[in-house]
Amino acid sequence: MLSVAILAAGKGTRMESSLPKVLHKISGKSLLQRVIDSCVELKPDQIFVITGHKSKEVEKSISNEKKIHIVIQEPQSGTGHAIQILCREVKKHEGKLLVLNGDVPLIRPSTLKRLLYLHDSKNADVSLITTKKRNPHGYGRVFLKGDFIERIVEEKDCNDLERENRLINAGVYCFNWGKLSEIINTLRSNNNQKEIYLTDTISMLKNSLSLEVEDNGELQGINNRIQLSECEENMQNSIKEKHMLNGVTFINKASCSISEEAEIGKDVIIEANTHLRGNTKIKSHCIIGPNTFIENSYVGLNCEISNSTVYASQIMDYIKIGPYSHIRPNSKISSFSKIGNFVEIKNSQLEEESKVNHLSYIGDSIIGRSTNIGAGTITANFDGEKKHQTKIGKNSSIGANTVFVAPINLGESVTTGAGSVITKDSKDNSLAISRTQQVNIENWERKKS
């Protein structure tokens, strides 16, 4: 039986934030959620999240997770105290207990599996992950005696000689839960921090083993915004390197961010300052950017999107968008269409070969195939209470500065005169025009003030 305990009760004072530390995000997911995701890969029988500071916020953030049990630690008196509370609340202490911090978001499932394998193969009382750091400041030092761990000394309790040891405790443990439960309540806060340390159990258990892993960033704990930024950078480098090896070009890799869920096809060029968020999919031979933000959207083959934002929409094949366009949720731009500069599309569908080239707002609309929308066109979709739809049939030509007062339905091959305010439906092959006749008054003189 495998149980997991994730320590997430701390205040995270050094983050200087009103948000609990474990709820800060790396590439769109909270630190805690990333740790949970790694642990789920192990297929544990149960997962305990031990929380304390702003526990309701933490619990709400993971409310959709299955097999998660919340344990409240009050007051927060150290890692050992957290496990004491867990052991009191859980009656059966069977099998293995994996304990890790909620602020190590890059921990890999494969590393955790290696730890579990070592623990099982050696029938250990406790096994933990260690690594050697060039600068071990802030970490507990691990001291070995032969193949076994003799003791762990926390940074603030180290003397000068002990601080020279570069082998550190990564804060990831696998215990024989039965043996741990026999000694856990004997722990005391006899240290400079006046906290109950889980590390004190190491010297009390006979068969204590170390799994030393390379310091490659996955064990980085997050205590401040600098470390949060470093962790984000490590994550982003890993994501972008994967895409580059699969045929994606980044013009300025450091200025871009890509979500883990994003899919990018071969021969896509990602220009500078481009950000792909959420479940975004980019098909092959696209040029995305510069200065472009796409979230939870589909982009088809051979598209170009420049200096624009796209949210929760579908951009089909061979489409050009931008610069300075805003595609809002629930929009679909069909193949061979063009969205030009300073255009906003919202909850609308444009059929194939349609064009909205300049300075227009298209909201709650259906635009037919091969229709051209002139500069400055507005669909006035809101009457103060409700949104209404505009429908324009295929092969239509909409004059510049046309305003459609929805709800309205235009047939196929309709033309509107420039500057018209269209308030009535129009049939196929008609001209709709609504404007006053121009009057020129000769010899006009403006009044002088």
From Swiss-Prot:
<feature type="binding site">
    <location>
        <position position="223"/>
    </location>
    <ligand>
        <name>Mg(2+)</name>
    </ligand>
</feature>
<feature type="binding site">
    <location>
        <position position="372"/>
    </location>
    <ligand>
        <name>UDP-N-acetyl-alpha-D-glucosamine</name>
    </ligand>
</feature>
<feature type="binding site">
    <location>
        <position position="418"/>
    </location>
    <ligand>
        <name>acetyl-CoA</name>
    </ligand>
</feature>
<feature type="binding site">
    <location>
        <position position="103"/>
    </location>
    <ligand>
        <name>Mg(2+)</name>
    </ligand>
</feature>
<comment type="function">
    <text>Catalyzes the last two sequential reactions in the de novo biosynthetic pathway for UDP-N-acetylglucosamine (UDP-GlcNAc). The C-terminal domain catalyzes the transfer of acetyl group from acetyl coenzyme A to glucosamine-1-phosphate (GlcN-1-P) to produce N-acetylglucosamine-1-phosphate (GlcNAc-1-P), which is converted into UDP-GlcNAc by the transfer of uridine 5-monophosphate (from uridine 5-triphosphate), a reaction catalyzed by the N-terminal domain.</text>
</comment>
<feature type="binding site">
    <location>
        <position position="328"/>
    </location>
    <ligand>
        <name>UDP-N-acetyl-alpha-D-glucosamine</name>
    </ligand>
</feature>
<dbReference type="GO" id="GO:0043886">
    <property type="term" value="F:structural constituent of carboxysome shell"/>
</dbReference>
<keyword id="KW-0548">Nucleotidyltransferase</keyword>
<feature type="binding site">
    <location>
        <position position="140"/>
    </location>
    <ligand>
        <name>UDP-N-acetyl-alpha-D-glucosamine</name>
    </ligand>
</feature>
<keyword id="KW-0012">Acyltransferase</keyword>
<feature type="binding site">
    <location>
        <position position="169"/>
    </location>
    <ligand>
        <name>UDP-N-acetyl-alpha-D-glucosamine</name>
    </ligand>
</feature>
<comment type="pathway">
    <text>Nucleotide-sugar biosynthesis; UDP-N-acetyl-alpha-D-glucosamine biosynthesis; UDP-N-acetyl-alpha-D-glucosamine from N-acetyl-alpha-D-glucosamine 1-phosphate: step 1/1.</text>
</comment>
<dbReference type="Pfam" id="PF14602">
    <property type="entry name" value="Hexapep_2"/>
</dbReference>
<comment type="similarity">
    <text>In the C-terminal section; belongs to the transferase hexapeptide repeat family.</text>
</comment>
<dbReference type="GO" id="GO:0000902">
    <property type="term" value="P:cell morphogenesis"/>
</dbReference>
<feature type="region of interest" description="Pyrophosphorylase">
    <location>
        <begin position="1"/>
        <end position="225"/>
    </location>
</feature>
<feature type="binding site">
    <location>
        <position position="73"/>
    </location>
    <ligand>
        <name>UDP-N-acetyl-alpha-D-glucosamine</name>
    </ligand>
</feature>
<feature type="binding site">
    <location>
        <begin position="78"/>
        <end position="79"/>
    </location>
    <ligand>
        <name>UDP-N-acetyl-alpha-D-glucosamine</name>
    </ligand>
</feature>
<keyword id="KW-0677">Repeat</keyword>
<dbReference type="GO" id="GO:0008360">
    <property type="term" value="P:regulation of cell shape"/>
</dbReference>
<dbReference type="InterPro" id="IPR005882">
    <property type="entry name" value="Bifunctional_GlmU"/>
</dbReference>
<feature type="region of interest" description="Linker">
    <location>
        <begin position="226"/>
        <end position="246"/>
    </location>
</feature>
<dbReference type="GO" id="GO:0071555">
    <property type="term" value="P:cell wall organization"/>
</dbReference>
<feature type="region of interest" description="N-acetyltransferase">
    <location>
        <begin position="247"/>
        <end position="449"/>
    </location>
</feature>
<comment type="similarity">
    <text>In the N-terminal section; belongs to the N-acetylglucosamine-1-phosphate uridyltransferase family.</text>
</comment>
<dbReference type="InterPro" id="IPR038009">
    <property type="entry name" value="GlmU_C_LbH"/>
</dbReference>
<dbReference type="Pfam" id="PF00132">
    <property type="entry name" value="Hexapep"/>
</dbReference>
<dbReference type="InterPro" id="IPR050065">
    <property type="entry name" value="GlmU-like"/>
</dbReference>
<feature type="binding site">
    <location>
        <position position="154"/>
    </location>
    <ligand>
        <name>UDP-N-acetyl-alpha-D-glucosamine</name>
    </ligand>
</feature>
<keyword id="KW-0479">Metal-binding</keyword>
<dbReference type="InterPro" id="IPR001451">
    <property type="entry name" value="Hexapep"/>
</dbReference>
<dbReference type="InterPro" id="IPR011004">
    <property type="entry name" value="Trimer_LpxA-like_sf"/>
</dbReference>
<dbReference type="GO" id="GO:0000287">
    <property type="term" value="F:magnesium ion binding"/>
</dbReference>
<feature type="binding site">
    <location>
        <position position="435"/>
    </location>
    <ligand>
        <name>acetyl-CoA</name>
    </ligand>
</feature>
<feature type="active site" description="Proton acceptor">
    <location>
        <position position="358"/>
    </location>
</feature>
<dbReference type="GO" id="GO:0009252">
    <property type="term" value="P:peptidoglycan biosynthetic process"/>
</dbReference>
<dbReference type="GO" id="GO:0019134">
    <property type="term" value="F:glucosamine-1-phosphate N-acetyltransferase activity"/>
</dbReference>
<dbReference type="GO" id="GO:0031470">
    <property type="term" value="C:carboxysome"/>
</dbReference>
<keyword id="KW-0808">Transferase</keyword>
<feature type="binding site">
    <location>
        <position position="346"/>
    </location>
    <ligand>
        <name>UDP-N-acetyl-alpha-D-glucosamine</name>
    </ligand>
</feature>
<feature type="binding site">
    <location>
        <position position="223"/>
    </location>
    <ligand>
        <name>UDP-N-acetyl-alpha-D-glucosamine</name>
    </ligand>
</feature>
<comment type="pathway">
    <text>Nucleotide-sugar biosynthesis; UDP-N-acetyl-alpha-D-glucosamine biosynthesis; N-acetyl-alpha-D-glucosamine 1-phosphate from alpha-D-glucosamine 6-phosphate (route II): step 2/2.</text>
</comment>
